[in-house]
Every structure is written in C-alpha cells, then in structure tokens.
C-alpha cells in the first residue's frame, strides 16, 4: 500500500473498532432475582468497582436484611416480633426499619391518616397478608373489629424504640419496596455506576441513560382502559 494517508486512515478505523469492542461503558448489564414475594431487577452500564459478582452479592445481602427487618411473611423478622408483642412491650428497631417507620408516620400525619401503616389487621382480614387467602368478603363485625386496631397515632416511636400499644399490626408493604429500590440505587452509585434502572415489584428508580445515550423506557401494563 503506497498511499500513506489511506494506510493511516485504515489504522484509525481498526483502532476505533477494537476500542468499541472493548468498551464496557457502552454495554448494558442486568442482574435479577427473587425478593419480597416478587422479583428485583437492576440494569446498568459500566463496570462496578469490585466487579459484577461482588455487586450482586451486596444487592442480595441488602435485600435479605430488609426482609429480615420489615417482612410480615417471616415470623422471626423485626416487624413480626413487634406485631406479636403484648400491650406495653417495646422493641429497639434496626436503624433502617426505624427510618422507614418514621417516614411512614410523617406521611400518615401529612395525609390525616389516609396513609396508615397500621392497616395490617384489615389487610390480613381481606386475605392480602401472610394469612391464608380467603375467597369471601369478611363479616361486617370482623371488619369493624379490625378497624378498631388501626390508627397510626397509637404508635410511639422514641428514637429507635417502638412501644406496642396493644393489638397494633404494622404492615410496611406499601413503603418497604420503594425503600429497597433506593437502597439498591445507593449501592450502585457507591460502586461507581451512574447509569442504571432499578425495579422491585413495579417500584422504579432510574439514573442517567442507556447505552448510546438513549433514555430508559419502562412499560405500563394496560395503559389504555379496556
């Protein structure tokens, strides 16, 4: 090849091709697994500082910790232990549990009780909790009895110590998944990942973009009525 300019151009093309093939920052990676009776999924670009296996291990460990603190489906979880206390009993909550509950109580106050994490007795009565499913509506007297046990204002959280007023059954399902999503996002950012999409049971958090700078897109199930 006698044309030095053409030779140089071909070298540049070859170099660019090899670089593109080795560019992990433009590659979409995905991790997933089961959690909280549903599934979790993390999509990201780039390479985690300690590698993908270490990131997945950290994610699974974090989700397990949240389950052990806030899952009413685990009889030995912190929330189940509180729900089983006699009136006047107290429990020192794990720090994440205390933070989530404090946020939930703030939301209850801001909405004048429209949002209330003590609604567990009604959730269970209608068959949406850890109790066996039911296929008929509960009796009116059972509904009223369950309602008497509901009321966020009954709770007293002193720093991390929560006192059981008697009969209160906490259910953090409406907020725990969102907290877990934020927790996983923090793990990704700590690992040097700034472009990601985290999803747990329909709860989402996104940052940055997909490869080639494309925006993250999520599907909405049956967005059109009917």
Show the residue positions of the predicted features.
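Mature catalytic core of soluble alpha/beta enzymes
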Residues: 2-11, 15-226
